[in-house]
Amino acid sequence: MAGHSKFKNIQHRKGAQDKKRAKVFTKLIREIVTAVKAGSTNPDNNPRLRTALATARSQNLPKERIDKAINSANDSANNENYTEIRYEGYAPGGIAIIVEALTDNKNRTAAEVRSSFTKYGGNLGETGSVNFLFKHCGVIQYPLEISSAENILETAIEAGADDIVSDEVLHTIYTDIENFSKVLEFLTDKYGTAEEAYIGWVPLNTIIIDDKEKAEKLLKLVDLLEESDDVQRVFGNYELSDEIYEILQGSEIICK
């Protein structure tokens, strides 16, 4: 699979999430509630809930909050209902962006997403306008020190994974959506809770951003999109060049 993000770019996005932990937890709970309402409280026969729980655990959502979310969703008095929507568009420089959202007000969310794209010179397109530039698949990440690349590769293949990439910080395992839960369970038994585990959009190829102004505008757009309570995840087919990353490292836009 082409277009793997460099570890520094991954760490930038993860750092932003770490600084907004409460908001991340809120989004994880929303996905759990939606999964239960769409299926059942039993993850064994509810693949979406199984995936939501795996993602929640990888982000260290406390067990008591997970249990509370499941019980709340199963309560007949709970009238929370969220619709899953995917927005697609282009950021400046032809960068393809996919935004996944869960919302109880589609008009509000569409207006927020469109406003974010417009503010930073992007264009919101129709659903399907950029997804052909990505592969929809499972992503599981472990820190490099958990095991050697050879051992991770052997275990991942045995588990049924499609691909694995190891860099200076992370082992990243890619799976078919259908095999995601099985592969994650196998790896969890072997290596413990993953650092990241989710179903997302991985770019088939990436565009290298080597201009400071373009990088700042792009990252501000992504951060603004992620600020929305309705937005679950944002994906893009870009990487920061080493030079641009070093220039921006330590700035508010990277550390925010």
From Swiss-Prot:
It comes from the Bacteria. Disulfide bonds: none annotated. Keywords: Cytoplasm, DNA-binding, Transcription, Transcription regulation. It is found in: Cytoplasm. One of its GO terms (cellular component) is cytoplasm. GO terms for biological process: regulation of DNA-templated transcription. One of its GO terms (molecular function) is DNA binding. Residues 1-21 are annotated as: Disordered. InterPro entries: Integrase-like_N, TACO1_YebC-like_2nd/3rd_dom, TACO1_YebC_N, Transcrip_reg_TACO1-like, Transcrip_reg_TACO1-like_dom3, YebC-like. Belongs to the TACO1 family. This is Probable transcriptional regulatory protein A1I_03240.
